């Protein structure tokens, strides 16, 4: 064999080697830092037709990126994506694809969050998802369809959240469902990032009860944080203490306990039992500690997928709370997603423009 022939063979072998290495290069990870929920559109909304088409458009994702966020969480409901017979609602699926493509065009990562299904709503008194195997199979089928729709998108850019704020009476019911859904998705999408919350509204203090698959690096743990409720949900109409319209403070005692005398027995009991108290930055961090510790033990990234303050309290107090909260997130390497973009806890003012002081806090490096 001539030197020329030997050199040619070596060149071919080297080319094959480098091509193989390139093919085996791991996909870019799904990495996020600060985002916003695009809520009350494909979830928790009666909007349909032209009203739904106009509520969120591609321009909104350009605005979100320009503000400085790096991802969006898009809640979707079963009633929007499928009718009562299980038939797909094509317009809603088309809107979901529009949203994902618009987000990607603006370099925003996306979490598709299955928020409410007919058998499970986080504020319902009872949910048949935990008692009826047929409803669990329906949920599995929803994820078969969503996975088939979404797998066209890069695993580095789109992630799935299995279910928002599971509220099983027994945490093992949620753990079993998580294991089943992950096995199913992994059969077709071994590297897709899956977001998993703890049982009971994704509360930080329920993380010790959560079980996640071992040796699965493509998982993000998620908790929600609205503590203290007397501050974050001041005068929110759906709470049982909405009648309280008095002052709110932070840091310090959120609501003066002497003011309980002016409340109904139900509202006073809620304030006394869990919604009120003395809160400062140190207390907030202690409240988050179980989730932070669990994520460290599991060596998995942690994400606060929802937090926010109803815009009815003094704005300086509101911003002070946001500043402490985001400082804690960043100090503990917790990614976070504000609830929400438009809607009840908005980052936009009445003219549709970003609240400059709020978004500066939310997007600070």
Predicted feature residues:
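Bacterial Sec-dependent N-terminal signal peptides
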Residues: 1-26
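N-terminal carbohydrate-binding accessory modules
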Residues: 22-71, 86, 294
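Surface-exposed, active-site-proximal loop segments in enzymatic domains
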Residues: 44-51, 78-94, 118-135, 347-353
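An active-site-proximal structural segment forming one wall of the substrate-binding cleft
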Residues: 54-55, 61-70, 88-116, 124-159, ...
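Short, solvent-exposed turn/loop segments enriched in Gly/Ser/Thr/Pro and often Arg
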Residues: 75-77, 114-118, 198-200, 337-345
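Active-site region of glycoside hydrolase catalytic domains
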Residues: 133-278, 285, 289-310, 331-334
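Aromatic-rich peripheral "rim/lid" segments of glycoside hydrolase catalytic domains that contact
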Residues: 313-365
